[in-house]
């Protein structure tokens, strides 16, 4: 049994946002579903009656991507505002199943490619 009494009495500092890169989208969906359910249950037992902005959301995932150019270079794009939020970035650097085109050839993403995408989102 997990003791969450301290969590029930605390007030969150900022809303949570999860930026899941393509390599980790399935795990991020599971984390998001668990977090949504947990926060809604915890919010329903809120004794103070305070409603915190962004505490209980339908999803904490944000839309982000790292599109690649023909040269193999990429850029990080976040399609919504994350100002004032605690952002967590999820990436699986060992996922070799993803590919991208560079100079007309299909390349598998290496751990370094995933790490570069992580830095682009940050």
What are these regions (language model features)?
Residues 1-122:
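PRPP-associated nucleotide enzymes
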């Amino acid at each position: 049994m997990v003791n969450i009494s301290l969590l029930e009495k605390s007030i969150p500092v900022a809303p949570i946002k999860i930026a899941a890169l393509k390599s980790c989208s399935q795990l991020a969906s599971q984390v998001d579903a668990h977090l949504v359910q947990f926060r809604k249950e915890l919010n329903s037992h809120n004794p103070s009656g305070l409603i915190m902005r962004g505490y209980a959301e339908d999803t904490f995932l944000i839309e982000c991507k790292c599109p690649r150019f023909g040269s193999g270079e990429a850029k990080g794009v976040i399609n919504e505002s994350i100002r004032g939020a605690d952002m967590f970035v999820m990436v699986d650097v060992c996922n070799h199943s993803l590919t991208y085109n560079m100079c007309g050839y299909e390349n598998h993403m290496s751990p370094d490619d995933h790490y570069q995408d992580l830095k682009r989102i940050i």
